[in-house]
Swiss-Prot record:
Entry keyword Amino-acid biosynthesis: yes
A family per Pfam: DHQS_C
Family: Belongs to the sugar phosphate cyclases superfamily. Dehydroquinate synthase family.
Gene Ontology CC terms, in alphabetical order: cytoplasm
Binding, Zn(2+): 184, 247, 264
Catalytic activity as recorded in UniProt: 7-phospho-2-dehydro-3-deoxy-D-arabino-heptonate = 3-dehydroquinate + phosphate
InterPro entries noted in UniProt: Dehydroquinate_synthase (IPR050071), DHQ_synth_AroB (IPR016037), DHQ_synth_fam (IPR030963), DHQS/DOIS_N (IPR030960), DHQS_C (IPR056179)
Example GO BP: chorismate biosynthetic process
Name this protein carries in UniProt: 3-dehydroquinate synthase
Compartments (UniProt record): Cytoplasm
Note on cofactor: Binds 1 divalent metal cation per subunit. Can use either Co(2+) or Zn(2+).
Keyword Protein biosynthesis recorded: no
Gene3D superfamilies: 3.40.50.1970, Dehydroquinate synthase-like - alpha domain (1.20.1090.10)
Amino acid sequence: MERITVNLAERSYPITIGAGLFEDSAHLSSLTAGQKVVVITNVTVAPLYADKILSLLQSLGCQASLLELPDGEQYKSLDTFNQVMSFLLEGSFARDVVVIALGGGVIGDLVGFSAACYQRGVDFIQIPTTLLSQVDSSVGGKTAVNHPLGKNMIGAFYQPKSVIIDTNCLKTLPEREFAAGIAEVIKYGIIYDAEFFTWLDEHLDALYSLDEQALTYAIARCCEIKAEVVAQDEKESGIRALLNLGHTFGHAIEAELGYGNWLHGEAVAAGTVMAARTAQLQGMIDQQQFDKIFSILSRAKLPVHTPESMTFDDFMTHMMRDKKVLSGKLRLVLPSSIGTAEVVADVPQEVIRQAIEDCRTIN
């Protein structure tokens, strides 16, 4: 078992990682007898894990309730947010309620935002069940819902009280969802840790075969990096923006093609290739470095090409709404080597256009 702390002074919290955590109530020991707890999950995750979590809560003497929501990125919306608010209000839950997000990134973001807003903020715990949410979205306090005009445009920075990661959840995860999570894992190697990138290149098969030791190491390393970055820059005014490698292109893909048609990690993978190609055209990385990035994402069974139906104008329409745009200037996160990245604000549109076009056929 691994334990990592996100250091944010009085708002610091633990991340616990290991196999079989759902069998031990010790990881929820901050909850007390009589405590009202609402577990919010979706219709896919509920049959797999809801009873286990409810049993742990009952063993602690908590008064536990369950809310099941529809499954899918399209439900990360204000309509579903209102559904959560109505459930909490109709149940007369007070400010001492604890909300648990049990699910993937959609549930984590939606429930976290709901916790931030309900009566101006109630405590919540993240229990991520997908690889993507375990290595990225459950850590760091970013919470949000989508708007038809942009992803994660309505949200708040709101930290959980703890994150509990049971790697056994990955045994029930479809391979497509697992691959989407691997995209975010690879991202950490590209932007922050060249040795980790090399390790991933050598252990990709072990990860896909769900080797417990490899999974625990990879998840823990990602969480360590995320915790280090968040401790330095909680509100994304500096270094934290680097965690968005591939996301500016990726969010454009998701918004244009419809939320849920591409998984978030799939869009990030294609976006990472476009960002790497942009960096290469800018002289920031060489052909060998680009090839390494392209190769590992391709081997991970992820999309690595520009969607056929999307034009340059489609991309720019959405990218200019990106949260990193300042004073009308598009800022892109680009790799400057394997293991480092930077935010670049002056990339000519013709370079972006060429990168998008090159990535239609590159191999």
